[in-house]
Amino acid sequence: MQKKIKNREALLSHGDIDGRKIVLDITEKTLQHLDAYERIKSIAHMEGDVLCIGSRRWDLSKKRNVYLLGAGKACNHMAMAVDEILGDHLTRGIAIVKIKEDTDVFRKTDVYVGGHPLPNEEGLRACKEIIKLVDSANEDDLFIVVISGGSSALMSCPIEGITLQDEIDTTDVMLKSGA
């Protein structure tokens, strides 16, 4: 697993070295335990054609399509784990993220960079793609959805009569008033 604290050596170059080591070790373990990618990998896996998530099981050989939908600030990591776990079973994925990272590797998932805290055009485009995908689905399709904090801004899709700019302006007013 990749280390979360990138500047460990610099932090240990001065001050109470022993105390700093203890704090950094605890912090590193905590960050690794909370990592969205690792959390998904710890609860989901494939057994042949069967997807196992916790105690639930889905035989993917009986599904027409398997889709991944995701949004949120931790979506990169969650969606990447699901994409990796499903492998060739995944038909298509759509992930709306705050920042596309250089380390993001997806096989079959389209990644959109939505706006946060203010919605943007790319988030709107992604939502329209999600709606098209959901509308084309039937009972033989399986959707796996991963949502994390920030998804309400990243997944902007105003109703008819409300523009994206209306939503941006409303969100901006709410943020400036402390909401």
Q: Could you say what each language-model-derived stretch is?
A:
Residues 1-179:
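N-terminal loops that bind phosphate or other acidic moieties
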